[in-house]
Swiss-Prot record:
<keyword id="KW-1105">Inhibition of host STAT1 by virus</keyword>
<dbReference type="Pfam" id="PF01692">
    <property type="entry name" value="Paramyxo_C"/>
</dbReference>
<keyword id="KW-1114">Inhibition of host interferon signaling pathway by virus</keyword>
<keyword id="KW-0899">Viral immunoevasion</keyword>
<dbReference type="GO" id="GO:0039563">
    <property type="term" value="P:symbiont-mediated suppression of host JAK-STAT cascade via inhibition of STAT1 activity"/>
</dbReference>
<keyword id="KW-1090">Inhibition of host innate immune response by virus</keyword>
<dbReference type="GO" id="GO:0052170">
    <property type="term" value="P:symbiont-mediated suppression of host innate immune response"/>
</dbReference>
<protein>
    <recommendedName>
        <fullName>Protein C</fullName>
    </recommendedName>
</protein>
<dbReference type="InterPro" id="IPR002608">
    <property type="entry name" value="Paramyxo_C"/>
</dbReference>
<comment type="similarity">
    <text>Belongs to the respirovirus protein C family.</text>
</comment>
<dbReference type="GO" id="GO:0039502">
    <property type="term" value="P:symbiont-mediated suppression of host type I interferon-mediated signaling pathway"/>
</dbReference>
<feature type="region of interest" description="Disordered">
    <location>
        <begin position="19"/>
        <end position="67"/>
    </location>
</feature>
<feature type="compositionally biased region" description="Polar residues">
    <location>
        <begin position="19"/>
        <end position="34"/>
    </location>
</feature>
<feature type="compositionally biased region" description="Polar residues">
    <location>
        <begin position="43"/>
        <end position="57"/>
    </location>
</feature>
<keyword id="KW-1106">Inhibition of host STAT2 by virus</keyword>
<keyword id="KW-0922">Interferon antiviral system evasion</keyword>
<feature type="compositionally biased region" description="Low complexity">
    <location>
        <begin position="58"/>
        <end position="67"/>
    </location>
</feature>
Length: 199
């Protein structure tokens, strides 16, 4: 009886062992592909999509030129918030003068005088930058600067030479730091002083 029970137990255990050893009808390992870890996948896509940081020399040169032009134009606004015109008659004269500055020979002559004086400022980086511009661009920039100075010198109530000279004193600290603006301001003075003398 004991032998029978023992042999039955051994047979049962052998069956279980055979079931564990025998292959199961599951998907084979060869057809299984493990998913790529998320971190690795992100790094791979980023490395393929990120553009190169190195820009061609021509792009860098163009951006530097744009910065220089922007710096020059920004200087025009430094004196733009000093006041507004109150005298209507004087304002009309100023607008006529500025129109001539852009459209008539007066502006061409004034720009040429400024250019000649800028040539003497060899040590000035800003002067050399202006002189390297194309003639048309240079003329427009000088005319804009002349207009700003005319409006600055004749702003508000300015109906006599004392007031006119007072405007000059107010911007002296700025002019001492910028030789180019001094040259342009002096030409603007010559262009606009007759508006005061005529009154």
């Amino acid at each position: 009886m004991l032998k029978t029970i023992k042999s039955w137990i051994l047979g049962k255990r052998n069956q279980e062992i055979n079931q564990l050893i025998s292959p199961r009808p599951s998907t084979s390992l060869n057809s299984y592909s493990a998913p790529t870890p998320k971190k690795t996948y992100r790094k791979t896509t980023q490395s393929t999509q990120e553009p190169s940081n190195s820009a061609p020399p021509s792009v860098n040169q163009k951006s530097n030129q744009q910065k220089q032009v922007k710096k020059l134009v920004d200087q025009l606004t430094k004196i733009d918030s000093l006041g507004h015109h109150t005298n209507v008659q004087q304002k009309q004269k100023i607008e006529i003068l500025i129109r001539k500055l852009y459209r008539e020979d007066l502006g061409e002559e004034a720009a040429q005088i400024v250019e000649l004086r800028l040539w003497s400022l060899e040590e000035s980086l800003e002067a050399s930058q202006i002189l390297k511009m194309e003639p048309k661009t240079r003329r427009i920039l000088i005319s804009m600067k002349l207009e700003r100075w005319i409006r600055t010198l004749l702003r508000g109530k300015c109906d006599n030479l004392q007031m006119f000279q007072a405007r000059y004193q107010e911007v002296m600290s700025y002019l001492q730091q910028n030789k180019v603006e001094t040259v342009i301001m002096e030409e603007a003075w010559n262009l606009s002083v007759h508006l005061i003398q005529d009154q």
